């Protein structure tokens, strides 16, 4: 176990919540001068922390506990009928891991995704600097999983490979391929890859009951939620 007591953390001032517009949010960050050590990262992921760019963070709101860390235990997961259909529908998609990088191919896909799927969000409008700062980090455990259909890039799953599982950082995909449900397929693939690697779980970030955009996470069962400082299994 890493000696977490020696680590420093900093809390932000209250700011508008990205998920619940009526709420003010506070975020707890690991000291940015602390090297991004994979063992520290893995241990903090067990406590609900996530990575964004070069920072590890988790919600630290005083009056709200709506953001609940969620993970899928890979060894226990069984796809339901709809998920099996998604897997079948995408059998012709190949997946390859590469190191994070900025390419025009990646950025073009990212722009199309943000403009068509998240034009109402705080990541709009997309920019090259935003893409690089958020996703293209030179970290030894970070991967871009390329999803290709007959050689054509249709999705990227930005994923951190940790000793305790895969952390699904961000996924973006071709909005023209809506029939394929590529976002859901990426999660199903990550669950399968976690099992193939003999790791524990896929860390999906935060589930928020009253946020419609987060509802998809509880479609993967069983799921574990981090509540009252412990992981609780829901079947």
Curated annotation (Swiss-Prot):
Its EC number is 2.3.2.29. One of its GO terms (biological process) is ubiquitin-dependent protein catabolic process via the N-end rule pathway. The keyword Acyltransferase applies. SUPFAM superfamilies: Acyl-CoA N-acyltransferases (Nat). Pfam families: ATE_C, ATE_N. GO terms for molecular function: arginyl-tRNA--protein transferase activity; leucyl-tRNA--protein transferase activity. It catalyses: N-terminal L-glutamyl-[protein] + L-leucyl-tRNA(Leu) = N-terminal L-leucyl-L-glutamyl-[protein] + tRNA(Leu) + H(+); N-terminal L-aspartyl-[protein] + L-leucyl-tRNA(Leu) = N-terminal L-leucyl-L-aspartyl-[protein] + tRNA(Leu) + H(+). It is found in: Cytoplasm. Disulfide bonds: none annotated. The keyword Transferase applies. GO terms for cellular component: cytoplasm. Belongs to the R-transferase family. Bpt subfamily. This is Aspartate/glutamate leucyltransferase. It comes from Ectopseudomonas mendocina (strain ymp). The lineage of its organism: Bacteria, Pseudomonadati, Pseudomonadota, Gammaproteobacteria, Pseudomonadales. The gene is bpt.
